[in-house]
UniProtKB/Swiss-Prot annotation:
One of its GO terms (molecular function) is actin monomer binding. SMART domains: PROF. The modification Phosphothreonine is found at residue 114. This is Profilin-4. Phosphorylated by MAP kinases. Binds to actin and affects the structure of the cytoskeleton. At high concentrations, profilin prevents the polymerization of actin, whereas it enhances it at low concentrations.
Amino acid sequence: MSWQTYVDDHLMCDIEGHEGHRLTAAAIVGHDGSVWAQSATFPQFKPEEMNGIMTDFNEPGHLAPTGLHFGGTKYMVIQGEAGAVIRGKKGSGGITIKKTGQALVCGIYEEPVTPGQCNMVVERLGDYLLEQGL
């Protein structure tokens, strides 16, 4: 299965029980910042934004004082899982980033999608990739 298929079929899909509700944008990105696959709506991000995210996975709390900057948008960092998941909120939307052995699974959402729904979609694929040794 191609990485693009994972994005299209497992991240940009309708959320279970909520037909028509889906993430705004999603991608699978290597730890080095290379994009493996992305939705057409996924924002272009800067290398320094990816560096900050990777630093936060290695040093949890690094982004909390400054916020999570991604694709030119600043998100307030909210409770995640140290070294495994970073979550950010901005207005009625937000971002979830799940770290696997080789990649970051990223999902961006706006209402009517809820933070919990975004977390579920992103983390389910991330957990699957971890189980596959990726």
